[in-house]
Amino acid sequence: MKLLGFLIVGLSAISALKTKALHLTCEQELRPYSAVVDANCMAFALNGSNIHEAIKYLQAMNIKKAYVLYWNDHDLRGTPMVLYDNGALAPFDPYTNTAKYVLCVEACPCPGSKAASVGGFQAATSSEKIYVEGSARPAQCSEVCIEPVERRPHYKKIVVNPSPSNCIPCEPECYDSSSSSECNKKRCKTFPRICKEKCGSRRRGCPRKVEVLKSQKTYTFDIEKYRRRGEVVVRVCSKDSKEKFERFILSRNGEIRGNNNKNCILEPLPKCLRCPGQLHKLKKHIERKVCQEVCMYINAKCDIFVLVGDCDFYRVVVNDRRRYRNLHLKKVRGHKLRELIKHGLFGVEFGPLDLDR
């Protein structure tokens, strides 16, 4: 009853509140209500009378979908619904239907008015006008809030998904000012290939054991050596049934040389790694596009993938390899992502190598 009373009071004072979309971290995607509580906001109560305004808000903010925690007085905080910018409303699924945003409401006080407590949060009666970056006209926070004529309207700028051209490539951050050494770059995740093999006797009555094998491989290119001499030292670290370390020199035309050990037969480099200079430029171009450092991988078919942040996996599609004009990042999710990780990925890194290792 207490919760129902809060909802009634909140709905009666909704004109004094403004809609807001909270961006969720990876941990918050499966429990969006915690983000609403941490932001000191109220859960947005979606119903037939305000669903069109909510859809317009998503379209104006360039948000494809967002969680809603109430629908027609039904409490959905445990199992939220996902509202799309096209009007579709679908139930939450942790594998196939998640969102990066959650809709909530926060106080929108009018200047000179007293704030009223709504459900434990401060709601108000003033007008703070908001406009969305790139929108044609500003949208008022509330129709009830009337601002004095002699007072110039105040606009608060909200930037959602800023244009890549306005971004500055992110540099590694140093938190230890006392250390003069170079900052440690972001450690990329590893995705080993996991397979199961049956072993043991084939005789009747003897159960066969299942052995789980894990294998992974990381290619590291000394790109500075490539720029100076026209050759690049490639270090390949393999971890499978036994750890293996390989190092060889790759010329500009992709030929391997400098290996005189007949007992050590090097595995051929994948075709997509034969031009590390172009691959390094591609990685830097993607980092400028997304305005952050990314991790690069390839699969057994030599498809190129990047991991942006800790959650978003993309396949790199390049139609024009000369200037990357038609570069497209195609997101991999759901069943395809699980299958991709199951079959394993090879890491691709660039950096100076210690030749004494």
UniProtKB/Swiss-Prot annotation:
GO terms for biological process: cell adhesion; sporulation resulting in formation of a cellular spore. A motif (HBM2) lies at residues 329-334. Glycans are attached at residue 47. Keywords: Cell adhesion, Glycoprotein, Signal, Sporulation. A motif (HBM1) lies at residues 150-158. GO terms for cellular component: spore wall. It comes from the Eukaryota. Residues 1-16 form the signal peptide. It is found in: Spore wall; Spore, Perispore. The keyword S-adenosyl-L-methionine does not apply. Spore wall protein involved in the adhesion to host cells surface glycoaminoglycans (GAGs). Microsporidian spore adherence is an integral part of activation and host cell invasion which requires the extrusion at the spore apex of a very long and coiled structure, the polar tube, through which the sporoplasm is pushed to enter into the potential host cell. Heparin-binding motifs (HBMs) are characterized by an XBBXBX or XBBBXXBX sequence, where X is any neutral amino acid and B is a positively charged basic amino acid, and are defined as the consensus sequence necessary for protein-heparin interactions. HBM1 motif is necessary for spore adherence to host cells. This is Spore wall and anchoring disk complex protein EnP1.
